[in-house]
């Protein structure tokens, strides 16, 4: 049994991340934990796993668990990178001695590796963990969890850095697993195909109020119901507000009329004055009732993930050649990753490069970026996977985005950041203090403010929440310029891109 009662989580500065949360995990639950970056998803998962988080949050309430939980972190810690697969799988901590009893459990180790579609022979391989691809590392980490015979799985963003092939495998693994689990993911396709419950953490009212929604629905149904709720709620709020202002205006007219009558009535008409006094008393009583009514008006629901920005007036000639690229060999060090690479990109093409982890997609995109950005006839912008390549993390978002520093420019930047749900304080924080999702939004805003007509993007949606991603996709679908991107996001590939190329050792191959 796994039961959470009245769990409240707060940062050391007092910001509430979760308030009075209670739930019971059922045997067939596959609960997806969603929310914007920085809302406490990973922190909650660690607390549920019994991991100490006292260095940055406090929590109250109780968690009762009489079953064995297994926790998958976002990444295998660096201290394991020089270890073999066997050494990693049989030790709980890096400094532990290997218990030789594990050698008698080779069958269980083999079974765990086979369960995640890995060749069990890697157990005898002396290769270091660092030499495996991102997808292979995730599978190895999952195999380690399964070797421990857990009753419950807690998975923190297992989709990070996975290629499409491994994503599809992970989807199948989660869907077919007999173990109950709670998992964090930004991948909408995986959420749609795997979840049967949603735990949504939000920070509303400029992060002054925590909101938690727990629904035993799959992701698609949750999004549909949530959208319906927001539309219905905001329609009711708008009608109530309009009716309230009508009543206020009528009240003011009556108040001013009675006030005028009181000021002009003759002192020789005491009876009339008395009647007006009673009338004013009734009018003020109506005013108090309207004040009470204002307190009970339905509040407009402003979704935290709203992204109210867009590219304006970008219009490239469809026939313009943006890139005419040929590369005999794509290499990293002395290793040849691909040969005979050919790609032509024109004005409004939206191109995506896909391929297995380690195939060289990011390296190739950087090389193409250098060619495109050397062309003065286009205005290209670049969003890398690692934002520190183009961002100074030691300055504020406002400092990063400004060019001239005029009062009008800074005011405009603040307005844009506000539309992206940045608080006034966050606008002045060093960028390094912000979440990866917030950094991504700042870079998107820079591409917009710079008026770029060509976007070069490496995994542009990887740090955005699944509820923010549809709005970013809509913005990029409507974008009138050219996009050259690398992505494993199936929704992005299907909805935004009109040309998809697979990179392998023989070059680029058109997929659509």
Predicted regions, residues:
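ABC ATP-binding cassette signature C-motif
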Residues: 1-233, 317-512
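Flexible nucleotide-interacting loop at or near the entrance of a catalytic core
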Residues: 100, 230-336
């Amino acid at each position: 049994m796994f039961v959470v009662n009245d769990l409240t989580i707060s940062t050391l500065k007092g910001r509430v991340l979760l308030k009075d949360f209670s739930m019971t995990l059922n045997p067939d639950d596959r609960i997806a934990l969603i929310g914007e970056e920085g809302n406490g998803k990973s922190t909650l998962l660690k607390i549920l796993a019994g991991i100490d988080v006292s260095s940055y949050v406090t929590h109250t309430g109780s968690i009762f668990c009489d079953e064995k939980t297994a926790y998958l972190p976002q990444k295998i810690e660096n201290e394991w990178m020089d270890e073999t697969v066997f050494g990693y799988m049989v030790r709980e901590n890096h400094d532990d001695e290997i218990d030789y009893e594990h050698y008698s459990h080779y069958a269980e180790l083999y079974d765990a590796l086979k369960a995640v579609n890995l060749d069990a022979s890697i157990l005898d391989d002396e290769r270091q963990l660092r030499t495996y691809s991102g997808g292979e590392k995730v599978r190895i980490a999952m195999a380690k969890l399964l070797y421990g015979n857990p009753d419950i799985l807690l998975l923190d963003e297992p989709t990070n850095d996975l290629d499409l092939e491994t994503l599809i495998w992970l989807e199948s693994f989660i869907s077919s697993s007999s173990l109950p689990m709670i998992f964090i993911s930004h991948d909408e396709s995986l959420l749609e195909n795997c979840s049967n419950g949603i735990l949504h953490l939000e920070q509303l009212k400029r992060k002054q109020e925590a909101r938690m929604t727990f629904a035993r629905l799959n992701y698609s149904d949750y999004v549909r119901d949530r959208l319906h709720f927001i539309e219905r709620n905001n329609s009711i709020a708008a009608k109530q507000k309009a009716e309230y202002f009508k009543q206020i205006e009528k009240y003011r007219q009556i108040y001013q009329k009675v006030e005028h009558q009181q000021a002009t009535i003759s002192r020789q008409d005491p009876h009339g004055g008395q009647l007006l006094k009673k009338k004013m008393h009734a009018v003020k009583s109506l005013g108090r009732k309207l004040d009470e009514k204002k307190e009970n008006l339905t509040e407009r629901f402003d979704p935290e993930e709203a992204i109210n920005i867009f590219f304006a007036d970008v219009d490239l000639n469809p026939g313009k050649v943006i890139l005419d690229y040929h590369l005999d060999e794509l290499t990293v060090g002395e290793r040849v990753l691909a040969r005979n690479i050919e790609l032509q990109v024109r004005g409004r093409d939206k191109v995506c490069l896909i391929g297995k982890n380690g195939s060289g997609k990011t390296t190739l995109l950087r090389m193409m970026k250098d060619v495109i950005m050397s062309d003065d006839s286009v205005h290209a912008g670049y969003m890398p996977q690692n934002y520190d390549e183009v961002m100074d993390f030691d300055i504020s978002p406002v400092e990063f985005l400004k060019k001239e520093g005029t009062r009008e420019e800074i005011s405009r930047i603040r307005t844009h950041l506000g539309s992206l749900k940045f608080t006034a304080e966050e606008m002045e924080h060093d960028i390094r203090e912000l979440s990866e999702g917030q950094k991504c939004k700042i870079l998107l805003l820079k591409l917009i403010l710079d008026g770029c007509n060509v976007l070069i993007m490496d995994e542009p949606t990887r740090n955005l929440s699944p509820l923010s991603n549809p709005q970013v996709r809509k913005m990029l679908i409507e974008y009138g310029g050219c996009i050259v991107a690398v992505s494993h996001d199936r929704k992005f590939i299907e909805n935004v891109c009109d040309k998809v190329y697979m990179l392998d050792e023989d070059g680029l191959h058109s997929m659509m």
